[in-house]
Amino acid sequence: FIVEGGSAGGSAKQARDRVFQAILPLRGKILNSWEVDESNLLSSQEISNISQAIGVYPGAEDLSNLRYHKICILADADSDGLHIATLICALFLKHFKKLVEEGHIYVSMPPLYRIDVGKEVYYALDEAEKESTVKKLDKKKPGIKKTVTRFKGLGEMSPGQLRETTMLQDSRRLVRLTIDNASYTEELMDKLMAKKRYADRKEWLEEKGNLAEI
C-alpha cells in the first residue's frame, strides 16, 4: 500500500496483515512526473522510494524482481487525496506502464462517511452513497437515530477502521488501473497533467466543468 501522509502510514502499519501486506508512507505531495525524463526520475526521493520498495525501475519491461502482486494507492477520499492519487496513477501509467498492463496497480477506495445506527456501522464512499445508505436505513430501521460522520482524512481513521475499509480482502474496495484504449488514455492524461497543455485544460474545464460534482 502506497499511503498518503505520515500519520495515515502509521495507522496503516498497525492495520495491515504483516504476513503479506506492507506499507510505504508518502510524506508530502509527489512529483508530477508526466513530463519528467526517466533518467531524472529517481532524483525525486518519493519516486525512488516507490521504485525500491516494489523492486522495479522506471521503464522496466522485466518484472521478475517485482516484490508484490498488488500495489495499492491509498489516499484520502477528498479532492486533495484524489489529486495525489491521480499524480501516482500518472507515475505508473507513464513510467511503470508494464505494471499497469499486467494488472498489478490498484486504487483503494476509502470511505468518506461513517454511518452509525445503534451498534451497527456502515461506510459510504461519497455523498451519493451516503444519501442512498441513509435512505435505505430509514426504511429498514425507522425511528432509530442515524449518526453521520465525515472523515477528514485517512489519518483520522483508527487502525481498525482502516483495516476494515481498505485492507481486509472481504470488505475493502479496490479498483484496478487498466488501459483499455492506449491512445485515448495517453491523450486524456496528457491533457490533465502536461504543463504545456494549460490552454487545452482550461478549455476542457470550461466546457465540461459543470458535469462534475464538487
Where do the protein language model's features map onto the residues?
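Conserved phosphate-chemistry cores used by DNA topoisomerases
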Residues: 1-214
